Amino acid sequence: MKIVEVNHPLVKHKLGLMRAHDISTKRFRELAAEIGSLLTYEATADLETEKVTIDGWCGPVVVEQIKGKKITVVPILRAGLGMMDGVLENVPSARISVVGVYRNEETLEPVPYFQKLASNIDERMALLVDPMLATGGSMIATIDLLKKAGCQSIKVLVLVAAPEGIAALEKAHPDVELYTASIDERLNEQGYIVPGLGDAGDKIFGTK
């Protein structure tokens, strides 16, 4: 599995701000979108372009455009919505697919409860966004769902990732690509990433 920890100074600075215990909902939300935008920049660096001729201000001009690559942005409810606007800044024509996953309290297994996928998803590259890759359960379940629908090109964008989640994702789906602002130390006993960001969903939506 291709794993990219984005070591750009802007990414590291913004993520450092997000780790503050007393950060406001407004600021956390802004930074989640900003890092989402920067991760998208990295994740789309290998898109193929083609030369086309357009009418410029002084006549015909040859320019480069992305070659026929259809994209869908896939936020995992609910926290993934906090990164979506930042991703769309770079790929504004992308279709949006939404997936909801909950954890069964008895089996502790992730269970998809909602999905609304873009049309022709089998022809699209999916940018799957969620702030955290902790155990990897929700991410793996979502990728299972996307592949079942025919989507075979999937890139995962997360703010922070735990080694345990990375290992689980690589075992289940070695063909996906992972882009993260940080590979953190570990999971604690409650399944939170350390040092992590706390509960990203609560911080984005201002809930507890």
Swiss-Prot record:
GO terms for biological process: UMP salvage; uracil salvage. 5-phospho-alpha-D-ribose 1-diphosphate binds at R78, R103, D130, P131, M132, L133, A134, T135, G136, G137, S138, D199. The keyword GTP-binding applies. CDD domains: PRTases_typeI. Its cofactor is Mg(2+). Binds 1 Mg(2+) ion per subunit. The magnesium is bound as Mg-PRPP. Transmembrane segments: none annotated. Its EC number is 2.4.2.9. It holds the Pfam family UPRTase. Keywords: Allosteric enzyme, Glycosyltransferase, GTP-binding, Magnesium, Nucleotide-binding, Transferase. The lineage of its organism: Bacteria, Pseudomonadati, Pseudomonadota, Gammaproteobacteria, Enterobacterales. Pathway: Pyrimidine metabolism; UMP biosynthesis via salvage pathway; UMP from uracil: step 1/1. The keyword Lipid biosynthesis does not apply. This is Uracil phosphoribosyltransferase. InterPro entries: PRibTrfase_dom (IPR000836), PRTase-like (IPR029057), Upp_B (IPR034332), UPRTase/APRTase (IPR050054), Ura_phspho_trans (IPR005765). NCBIfam families: PRK00129.1 (NF001097), upp (TIGR01091). It catalyses: UMP + diphosphate = 5-phospho-alpha-D-ribose 1-diphosphate + uracil. Allosterically activated by GTP. GO terms for molecular function: GTP binding; magnesium ion binding; uracil phosphoribosyltransferase activity. Catalyzes the conversion of uracil and 5-phospho-alpha-D-ribose 1-diphosphate (PRPP) to UMP and diphosphate. Uracil binds at I193, G198, D199, A200. Belongs to the UPRTase family.
